[in-house]
Amino acid sequence: IVLETNDKCIIQNIQHVELFEGNIYILDDKSRTLCVFNMNGTFLYRIGDIGNGKGEHIELSDFAIDRKDKKIYLWDEATDKANVFDIDTKDYIYSIKTEREGSRSYYILYHNNKLYTNHTLLNNDDETHLLREIDCETGKQIATYLNCEEYNKGWNFPLRMANSCFYSQNTTSPKYVDIFGDTILSILPDRLIPAYVVES
C-alpha cells in the first residue's frame, strides 16, 4: 500500500501500526503524530495535537485501541498520561493521568478492559518491576509485575526502544518482553505466564 503524502501526513519513522475496521493507524516517531489512512493509502485524518491543552500531547510515544468500545488511547511519555478519543467521532473524551513517582513509561497495551504500561526508573529506589497495570478510568496503579533482576538482567533505567515491548497485541494473549529479557510472557486476563524462554 502506497501512503498518500501531504503537509498533514508526512511519515518519517513508523513507531507503531494498527489495522482497525478498514483503516490503518500509524504513529510517526519523528512528528509525534497519529495518522489514519484507508486501505487504499488515502490520508483521512490525524488524531490528537501537540500542545498542553485538553487532549493534546507533548511526546506521543505509543497508542492502543479498545476494539470493543471503539476508543483509542494516545500515550504521552513526557507526562505519563493517556488521552482517550472516540474512534468513530474522533472526539476527545478524557485523559488518564498516572502517578509518575520517579518512573517513566513509553509503551502501552489495552487488553481485556485493562491498561498496561512498561515501567522504567528515573532514580534508584526499591521499585524493581518492569510492568504495571493501570485503572482505565482513574490512572491509579492496580498491580505491578516482573522483577527486573529476573526478567531483564537487572536493567530498569529509562531507555526508549525502537519498537514496543508489547507484541501480538490484538490476540487473546498478547506478549511482553523487555530489551534484555530472555523470557517472552503471555498476558492473560488474570495473570502473566512464560510463553517462550530463549537459552543463551
Regions of interest found by a model, annotated:
Residues 1-200:
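Eukaryotic scaffold repeat domains enriched in small/polar residues
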